[in-house]
């Protein structure tokens, strides 16, 4: 089904606070986009979702920025259909989660969850403006179309129908998923305390509409090394922070190889082993100066059942030994290892009830699978919600320049939401 071109949606809106924004979050004089959406309900939900996607993508919600403009837009959109939302803000007050119940407040509902933040575009060679959805050759291009504003747009487009159902859908929108799943826990805790027990939680990460019942957990660490500067020809007169950092990184590589050799090849994950990768590194000021500082960040992604504390125990011992040896030579030097983020794995629980329900929505009978990336599924599962992942688009098309989603996937996501609305009517 082609997406009707007549469903274009005005992006300006005027929230209750009196400020006017365009979808970029800049103050403008606009019309109420929520009213425009209401007027467009005569066209297909897919077309409405496509218009909402334009709006959501145009908000720059890179994890380093505030997401409040997007959250306010969603609040006002939901309010038009009588759906009241609750914010769960961060300590600084510049970001917020949002959750809302469409339909009656009764047990047995479905959580639809997605994150509002996206990865940066800086340093990437985009063919067009990443904050404007471009349609070409059967694809939708733009930052977040696949991961995961496409899913959010589809869910929001179906709110008018979901709000009239006899069984609730609980919408959950988080922040800071891309930097260690930091935002969702506070929202999940609040939801667990305030909504009747749901049947399941569906995390709409891009899975090509396949059912995912397991994902790896993630732990992110920062290593800072403080050296003692001296001329690089006088190595005994100082300590190069870079050389110490390289020694620690070499140990990480050894641990990674050991994990690969000991992995359970039949655990359903690809790759099957827990992985260690270094994503950031910096240090030193000049080639002829023993580096006074060094810093690097690494992550550990482990499948369920891996004792991550045991995996990293040798590294902690090494850092402690290096720290003591450096301090014995020069005061103020040393090594500091800090965990800066973590999220648990999602473990297949052996129950087929949730998967069977979602198969009715996807229309596919393919067996459930597992993925190597981390997501918020494990956090929902730890709160006692039966949880799985299913969403349009592919993780292989996310996080890269010209991020894209097949129109066929977007339409498959719309059919999924249509069937959900029918099931809960």
Task: Kindly give the residue locations of the regions a language model identified.
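Short, positively charged low-complexity motifs
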Residues: 9-10, 34
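N-terminal, intrinsically disordered charge-dense segments
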Residues: 18-37
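Acidic/His- and Gly-rich active-site-bordering loop/insert found
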Residues: 40-145, 164-165, 394
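Metal-dependent amide/peptide-bond hydrolase catalytic core
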Residues: 44, 91, 222-425
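Fold-level recognition of mixed alpha/beta catalytic cores in primary-metabolism enzymes, strongest
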Residues: 137-140, 145-146, 150-254, 270, ...
């Amino acid at each position: 089904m082609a997406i009707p071109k007549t469903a274009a949606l005005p992006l300006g809106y005027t929230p209750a606070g009196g400020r006017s924004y365009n979808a970029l979050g800049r103050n403008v004089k606009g019309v109420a986009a929520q009213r425009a959406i209401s007027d467009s309900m005569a066209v297909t939900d897919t077309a409405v979702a496509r218009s909402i996607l334009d709006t959501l993508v145009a908000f720059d919600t890179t994890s380093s920025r505030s997401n409040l403009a997007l959250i306010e837009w969603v609040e006002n959109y939901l309010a038009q259909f009588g759906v009241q939302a609750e914010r769960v803000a961060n300590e600084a007050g510049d970001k917020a989660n949002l959750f809302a119940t469409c339909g009656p407040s009764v047990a047995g509902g479905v959580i639809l969850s997605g994150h509002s933040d996206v990865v940066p575009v800086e340093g990437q060679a985009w063919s067009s403006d990443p904050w404007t959805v471009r349609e070409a050759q059967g694809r939708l291009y733009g930052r977040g179309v696949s991961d995961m504003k496409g899913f959010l747009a589809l869910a929001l487009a179906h709110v008018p129908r979901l709000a009239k159902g006899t069984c609730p859908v609980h919408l959950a929108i988080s922040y800071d998923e891309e930097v260690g799943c930091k935002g969702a826990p506070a929202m999940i805790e609040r939801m667990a305390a305030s909504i009747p027990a749901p049947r399941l939680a569906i995390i709409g990460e891009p899975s090509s509409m396949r059912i995912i019942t397991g994902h790896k957990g993630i732990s992110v660490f920062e290593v800072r090394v403080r050296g003692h500067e001296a001329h690089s020809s006088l190595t005994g007169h100082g300590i190069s922070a870079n050389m110490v950092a390289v020694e620690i990184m070499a140990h990480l590589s050894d641990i990674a190889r050991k994990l690969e050799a000991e992995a359970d090849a039949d655990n359903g994950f690809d790759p099957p082993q827990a992985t260690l990768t270094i994503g950031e590194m910096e240090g030193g000021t000049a080639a002829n100066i023993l580096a006074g500082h060094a810093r690097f960040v690494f992550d550990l992604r482990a499948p369920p059942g891996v004792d991550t504390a045991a995996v990293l125990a040798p590294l902690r011992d090494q850092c402690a030994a290096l720290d003591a040896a450096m301090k014995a030579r020069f005061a103020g030097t040393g090594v500091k290892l800090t965990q800066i983020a973590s999220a648990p794995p999602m473990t297949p629980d052996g129950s087929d009830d949730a998967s069977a329900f979602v198969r009715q929505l996807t229309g596919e009978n393919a067996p459930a699978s597992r993925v190597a990336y981390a997501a918020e599924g494990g956090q929902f599962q730890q709160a006692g919600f039966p949880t799985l992942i299913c969403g349009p688009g592919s993780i292989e098309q996310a996080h890269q320049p010209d991020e894209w989603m097949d129109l066929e996937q977007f339409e498959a996501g719309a059919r999924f939401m249509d069937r959900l609305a029918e099931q809960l009517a």
